[in-house]
Amino acid sequence: MSITPYSTYHLIKSQDLNHHGTLYAGRCADWFVESGFIAACSLAKSEHIVCLKIHGLLFSKPAHLGDILCFESKVVLAGRTSLISHVQVIKDGQPMLDGFITFIHVDLKGKPQPHNIIITATRPEDLDLQKKARQLRP
């Protein structure tokens, strides 16, 4: 399968702010995982996908009330039972955060189950993301 990007958008409202008046990191982490999950569920049924690990969130700039954030996600690497999504958050056309999330494909009892998905990267940026994702695996 080729790498397909998915975009979701969020408007920052007053209930999304922290005590500094900027986007609460926990709210952003929630949206971040949701975006990666959507990409993973494009390849497998949602009832078979669980989150294993978020691989770092580094905020390069703050987000404020009224900002609209674009979460661009794509599955860049597939293991035997794992799917690794890359998520980039964009504000005003500029990246403000990115990271990886590992999801596991499970059976209905929650045990890891092979998914038989093969991801093929062709674009240089996707090949680079695949290389970084491989370094995250134990």
Features from the language model and the residues they span:
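HotDog/MaoC-like acyl-thioester-processing domains
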Residues: 6, 64-65, 76-138
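Generic structural detector for well-ordered beta-strands
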Residues: 9-13, 58, 102
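Catalytic strand-loop segment that frames the active site of acyl-thioester-processing enzymes
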Residues: 1-25, 132-138
